[in-house]
Amino acid sequence: MICASKITMLGLLVMCTLGGVLGKVDIRQTTANKAFMETMRADGYEVVHPFQIRDKNERIGIDTRNYFLKAQEHYSHVTIVIRSNQLGRLKLVLERNNFIFLNQTAFHKLDADGERVIQNRVENCYYQGTVGGEESSFVALSSCNGLRGVISFANGTTFGIWPLDGGDRNSRRHPHILYKSEWSQEAKCGSSMAHAVGQRRMKKHVHKHRSHHHEHNKKRDVSKRTKYVEVALIADYEFMKARGLHDLDAISYMLESLNIADSMLSRDLNIRLSAVYVELWTDVQRIDLWEDIERTLSGVVDYASGHIYHIQKDASILFTAGSFANQEVSNAAIRSICTARSAVIVKGVEQFATHWNGELLAQSIGHLLGLEHDTTACSCEPSPECVMRQQPGRVGGGGGSPFSWQFSKCSVARMHGIWQDGNIQCLLNKPFQVSELRECGNGVVDGSEECDCGSRENCQDPCCDPLTCTLRPHAQCAAHHKCCHRCELRKAGDTCRSSKSPCDVAEQCDGKSGDCPPDGHLIDGTVCGTDGQCWRGNCSDSHQQCQKLWGREARVAEPVCFEQNTKGAEYANCGQRQADGTYHPCQIEDTRCGTLHCHSGSITPIDSSLKAFTFHFTENSHQIQCKSIASAAVGLTSDGTNCASGRVCVAGSCVEMSSVSSATACPTNNLALLCSGHGHCTTTARCVCFNGWSGVACDIRSNSSTYQGSMGFGEEGSGGSSQKSSERKTIMIPHLNIGTTLETATLFAILLGFGVFLLLCLVCLMLCYRRRSVVEIPKPSDEKDEESPDRQIKFGNMPSYREEKRKRKSNKKIYGALNRITEADERDSTSLRSRDSAGGSQQLVDRRNGAPVVVGGIRDPYAGEHIYAESSSNHLTRQFRGINSDGSYPLRSFGSWRSSAPISPASSSGQLTDVSTATTPLRLNKIGKFLKTLQSDDESPSPFSDHQSFTTGIGIGARLEQMQFGGGGDEELSAVEADHDVGSNTESSRGCEEPMDPGSWDSPTLVNGASSSSTSNNYNFRQSPSLFSDPFKLEMTNSMHN
């Protein structure tokens, strides 16, 4: 009865509409019409006659084929008008979907005869558009055999359109059924059960896939670029049986569903779907259909990997008519796009309403990309339901659930983060461009290529062979790798990608691969800035946003300013509509995410081209200033800004953080805290430890750390798990290191540098010391000229000191005093030698005529020199001036006297000045008294001038020698004691014990036994042996003799 009443009503409507034109056609008896009408409610549809408007408002039929060009080519742009009693006049502005499939798309059918190519040409008659250009409406339909598709509005009201059999499709009066669409059965998504498994699987594939692409497709904002998902459509045997094994009907159903899903994804996510392969099973079921949809999905993955592996695709989609447990109608592997596990299974829930399958397909593609189900906090105003809902179909409560074609703001925010992470670079190429890319020499590394430096003529990579696109034998990596230097892998720890913001982290090479690790950042919600938090690797801080707009003194305005956003005015709103340019008023809970209001700062914006508003009002006797920018691009509060506890702003809405940011499981030893509560977690599941903590899970106390918190980072309280590999390493954030703790490598470098500095200082000191130690005192010029290279030094008979040693042992006290005298004597000798060297250019002067005295052709270097310490023999000689000589001038010598200049007898009374004899050891008991005598004589020296005084001096020397060796040991002891009392230790203080009688020196002792009566002119006198050995005197004596 119900069916009969429906058919009767349908017949009445059709007859009233068509009149006598179609009165002869009994559309109630058509099998297709009867099957469709059985699914309609009596009051939920109406018959309409759509028509097409072409140029110059010409009204034609609904056939969109362009017969002027090709019979099977449809117009790119069409406009369909539908007059409805309920909706009024609907003007559908449509554009052909040129990406749904291409000429290269292969349509295959598998039957008992094997695999065959479907010969019938598939027409592209699939359109997308809006109602009257209103962006808040949704239209997707096909026009191959009448109009068949969906028309939806922003409030969730959805209508389906279906063509009736009969009549002329080229006429303007072809009947269609316009009906209100709602879900008629329970339907759930099965992907939630596979979420955890799929996510773990995806993490293993992300880095492997990116290692081939992310170095060339560098991280960049691709949210505005169109992405293309190439899919392989498979219709299993159960699905084909439900459609009577009609090839074109099955293909049309799948393409209509794909067209609707493509329209949803392209509007909000800028993703296009394209069928690159279509396969129909018309003989047997090639995979097992289990009640467990997850197990069935595994069979789809195995089939796609084993049978259609040669098809270059991003995902495989199976349409089936099988039934699964728990009313599950779809399933997909979470975040598996561009991998071998990228597969979707969709049940054909409605035979005539393809838009329900289109919604399921769009949701499944979202799961492949990484989108999760929306929570109750996510909305897509004004539509009550969003695409990523967990339960698409619900029955009860006065009707079914509405059709959803909008993605929530949570899903849009998640997808934007996925694009920023750069994990889906495979979607940037257009369909069928893979064959062009996957060839050696195009400069892009793809497939099994190890490198690709372009053509042989243009290759600049010394590590890559341009002919085979493989590494050269000596190379470990290629030049395009971030962790490669001169064809060798960079050592572990080298930074290959620096941080770009306070919420970003620097990646380091691992020393095993030339690829830089995946780009990661601190997880969303990490505190940063003045009052901000991390969002997609950047710090979202309203204070900093105000400072960028109004200057450094600007701050966020009072909360009352944000309440103005509910007005939807130009200066206070939650966004601008693209269709008519009007502004969205904010909901009360979203006011903080609308127009950003600031106060203070400059009067006008820093960017003078921006249109700004400033208004003041008083509240509770308090003056409040609100400054805003009338530009949605820069005037709205930035995404990721904290708007409430655990909530963030996304596209003008305040949503829960957990609904827009995927949870990341970082290693920890406390399940309640990420990174053990001592660090921050990154999107790559690694920990950045606080100062004083280290280890994979930041659970080890240490004196140093790779992180010192800046930017006001606080500890997170969200949970996490520790089910991560021990291979994870604590990484470093260089720009956040503002403390005093240094790295071990830094300390080692400082220590090494300090050691090198000390070594250089030591070398410099050694060089300076060596230079100073080799300085030689130059000899006087006259000594250099007079010295003969053949000169020999003769020492003669050296005295024996054995007796002296014996005496030293017997009386150490005496010899101790003598040693002190010896040291003083050596110092005086050194001083005398220096004076002699300095006066080497002086000459002996004859007092009689002032002429210099030359002895043996050599000028005496000591003639006329002032005597610093005169010997006792010379002092006594001056007392006996009556002694005559044989006419020779006595010359001062050390150890002997000689004369070479004749002196006349008349001059015997003259005096010879500045002449000294060698020192002779004297009795020491009268040293003090003799010292006073020498001092008085030094002040008024008296020269002797005759030979007699000269000979007398000789006698004195002999007598002094006799006195020295003739005295007893007691006298020597008393002399030493006297010397000790006086305190003198110089040669000038060595005097005689008492004055001696000059008459006792009549017979001087001559050298070599010569008698005193000898008349020889050259006298060589032997000086008495001294108690002290003076090598300087010995050297000078020999030089004088020679």
UniProtKB/Swiss-Prot annotation:
It is found in: Cell membrane. Residues 1-23 form the signal peptide. Keywords: Cell membrane, Disulfide bond, EGF-like domain, Glycoprotein, Membrane, Signal, Transmembrane, Transmembrane helix. One of its GO terms (biological process) is membrane protein ectodomain proteolysis. Residues 779-809, 825-850, 980-1028 are annotated as: Disordered. Changing A557T: In e541; uncoordinated movement. This is Disintegrin and metalloproteinase domain-containing protein unc-71.
